[in-house]
Amino acid sequence: MKTTIHDIAERANCSITTVSQVLNGKGQRFSSELQKKIVTLAKDLNYRPNHVAVSLVTKRTRTVGLVLPNVHNMYFALLAEEIEKCCRQLNLDLVLCNSLDDPRMEENYIDTLIGRNVDGIIVALAINTTMEQCLKNMQKVADDRIAFCLIDRLLPSKELDMVTINHELGGYLATRHLLDLGHRRLAFLTGPEKLLDAQLRLKGACKAISECPSCEVPFIFTGDYSWEKGYEMAEQIVKSKPSAIFAFNDWSAFGLIIKLKEMGLRIPEDLSIVGYDDIPLLNGGVLSLTTIHQPIDQLAEEALNTLLFRFENQDAAAVQRVIDPSIRIRKSTRNLMN
């Protein structure tokens, strides 16, 4: 039979209210001896709180919803893992939703999470989600007093809680590295044109180019962050005869490298390549890709901190946190000045 608070109270010879307060961290007014006795009994009797009953009293379910655009993308899989880890440390449950980069599915999942009375929702937007759709979803969430935070993929709004990487700096660092190695004829394989993070990476890359008078105008190819697109675009990119390629994410770089090797080209002897994300599986061993490191663990932690702040400060101004990336120099780039 499942142990209840009543069972613990009987054995501790105290009231149910006392047991409840101690187990919820509010028993400071009771003696340390009694507190220890109650906690020990709860552990020995394998007591598990009734979360439904707790939520009815506290109006909290201790549940967070996470809506991601594509969990098959390893970057988002790693992000989900880090957020789950943070939730576990905070004793929060996590509900994971995969929108498949579909704004309608994204909205449906948000509606479902609202219906499940989650305490907060973290969203990495689908590629084609508009400002209007995002604000509509935020309003529905706000009406139910649910915390809402955008992560990674953003929209240019000062009304939304959001946590992101400084993608303009990331684009700048990647390009600056290639320029410092003596490369002057560059190609960029970008992300989807509609995504703000791809636009910011391009802006940063172009800023670095503008600081180098001897640099040629870069060749810009539109990608979609998939390895398939990187593979598909490789021949077209090579025809422009760059000495180096900046792929706007690691998956695109991975697809590029596979095709380039099939074409008999060597990395970095024939072409230098820089990626973006620093996905562990793609950046060790044979590949050893120079890339922009996104601190996913910090991104996840800040997103949860933002939700926790919003739980207690519903009417405060929007929280917007920007985390700086860094470059990881490995073996996929060559110095042309040696």
How does the language model describe each region?
Residues L45, L90, D144-R145, C212, ...:
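Helix C-cap/helix->beta junction micro-motif
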Residues M1-T61:
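N-terminal helix-turn-helix DNA-binding module of bacterial transcription factors
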Residues T4, M233-N338:
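Flexible loop/turn connectors
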Residues K59-R176, D180, E235-S240:
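Alpha-helical recognition/docking segments in bacterial nutrient-uptake
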Residues P69-L78, C97-M105, I127-M131, R153, ...:
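Hinge/beta->alpha junction and helix N-cap segments in small-molecule ligand-binding domains
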Residues R184-R185, E216-P218, R266-S272:
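Short acidic capping loops at alpha-helix termini that bridge into adjacent secondary structure
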